[in-house]
Amino acid sequence: KRDGSPFLCLSDFIRPLSSGIPDTIGAFASSIDADMEGLYQQDPYKHLLVQTLSDRLAEAATEKMHEYVRKEAWGYAKDESLSMSDLLVEKYQGIRPAVGYPSLPDQSINFLLDELLDMKQIGITLTENGAMYPHASVCGLMFAHPASEYFSVGKIGEDQLEDYARRRGKRDRKSVV
């Protein structure tokens, strides 16, 4: 990077197996009822409102799930008491990057998460390219590391893409983006 800050990777926020110390990473998925997608098809304004509300509900479910993980399941923030404004600016420990966002842009990760989570149990199906249906669905990973932060992978070179595809066990580099 030009500003001298480090190049980050999500694996920076989880202990390597070679450390011999166990660590935890979480996987999540949330969605709204697929029937919401069909509401108000004849009224573009109301349909857009339903789509927007559906997206917000899926994100809110993820936020609530992350709070449960921080306070109870993993318990590293048992006494956390954040205001709504603190929640909105993510003043909590840990991150939950979603697939397709800047720190986890590879949409093919959805297939791995589907194998782990069996997302069809909550009504999520994947297209051949890994896009989720219903569209108001979100999945990703949870990290508790105190220094974890969101970042953007940014532009990568052909050599990096080929190396990534090889390490993912993919023959064609196009199958990982």
Label the model's feature ranges.
Residues 167:
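Residues within the alpha-helical elements of helix-turn-helix
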Residues 1-148, 159:
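Small-residue-enriched alpha-helical segments and adjacent helix-cap loops
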Residues 153-158:
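Short acidic alpha-helix initiation/capping motifs at coil-to-helix transition points
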